Structure formats: C-alpha cells, structure tokens
C-alpha cells in the first residue's frame, strides 16, 4: 500500500507528539489520538507530501 504523507519539520512532529499526549491525558486511547492528529495534519497541511510504502504482510 502506498500513502501520501505530509512532510513535516521536526517542530511540526514535536507538536503532533505533544497533541497526541494531550489527547491521551484526557482519556483518549493512543490509537484514537494518533488517528485524530493524523487526520488534522492531513486537513491542515499545505506543504510537500512524501510517498511511503506500507507492507500489509509479514515476510
């Protein structure tokens, strides 16, 4: 599977981590927090995208 992912600076990555931690502190599961922050990043990102390939099967 290929996915277009936002290319983030270190500062943007750090803010995303802090946002995930904040949501988890409020009682959200880690999976939900990551999914929400990823959705927010995709919705608000205006920079470059990188292409990443994810393997669904174990080798």
Curated annotation (Swiss-Prot):
InterPro entries recorded: UPF0181
Pfam families registered for this protein in UniProt: UPF0181
Highest taxon above the source species: Bacteria
Entries under NCBIfam families matching the protein: PRK05114.1
UniProt similarity note: Belongs to the UPF0181 family.
Name of this protein: UPF0181 protein YoaH
Organism of origin: Shigella flexneri serotype 5b (strain 8401)
Taxonomic path: Bacteria, Pseudomonadati, Pseudomonadota, Gammaproteobacteria, Enterobacterales
């Amino acid at each position: 599977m290929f996915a277009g992912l936002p290319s983030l600076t270190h500062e943007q990555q750090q803010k995303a981590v802090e946002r995930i931690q904040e949501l988890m502190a409020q009682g959200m599961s880690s999976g939900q927090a990551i999914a929400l922050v990823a959705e927010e990043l995709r919705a608000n990102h205006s920079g470059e995208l990188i292409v990443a390939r994810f393997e669904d099967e174990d080798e």
